[in-house]
Amino acid sequence: MNTKGLVNWAIWISVISGIYCLVYLFTVGQFTSDNVLPGWQIVYATFTALPIYFTAGAKREDFIKYICSYLLGVCWGMLYLWIMDRLAGMGIITNPWVNIAVVVAVVCTVECALHFTVLSKLPFSVVPAQFGAISNTFWCSNMSIAILGPGASAIGGFYNFQAIPILMITLCGGTLLGLLCNEGLNFIDAETGNWKWPGK
């Protein structure tokens, strides 16, 4: 694609992303700020899901695989935090940095081994997407602790999962945005870089 086409694609991506943010902030973001994390929202999780899917080509046929992998990644992230919390709460590993290092090393080994081998053909084994979701789960939980305090079931103060459903919605939104960004190529002539109607 020539420079004109790339510029037009950049315009498409920017406009679509702006529309997404506007819709998100007036719906999910407003709900989050009013009901989940008072005065806050987490639209920025979108921009973890989007680039991971987008740089992999954002193929239509991979859309569900990425959605499922992000959602499972959040579950993995919750498991990491739950184990860290239990180890801290029971006094087994009291140093938080050692706790995090040990749990990440062990659980990551199990996670990768499973998804690289016996689960590799299933539609939730895109490990980079899982890692992105795990990272988001960690900061989302920490942010929730900072705003609301540790979760009611946390015995070591390591987690608060209050905003996790919103995080899941946002990661799915980011995946959809990645698909829409890539679909913009259908409206650009690959040779001339001009706008066109798909199929013509």
Provide a role label for each language-model segment:
Residues N35-I42, G91-V103, Q162-I166:
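Membrane-interface starts of transmembrane alpha-helices
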Residues V7, I11-V23, T27, F63-I83, ...:
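Hydrophobic, lipid-facing residues on alpha-helical transmembrane segments of integral membrane proteins
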Residues F31-G57, A105-S153:
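Pore- and pathway-forming membrane helices of multi-pass small-molecule/ion transporters and channels
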Residues M1-F47, P51:
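N-terminal topogenic module of multi-pass integral membrane proteins
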Residues I188-K200:
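Short, highly charged, low-complexity non-transmembrane loops/tails of multi-pass membrane proteins
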Residues T27-D34, W82-T94, G156-A163:
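Helix-coil boundary and interhelical linker segments in multi-pass alpha-helical membrane proteins
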Residues M1-L6, F54, A58-Y66, I92, ...:
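Membrane-helix interfacial "entry" motifs
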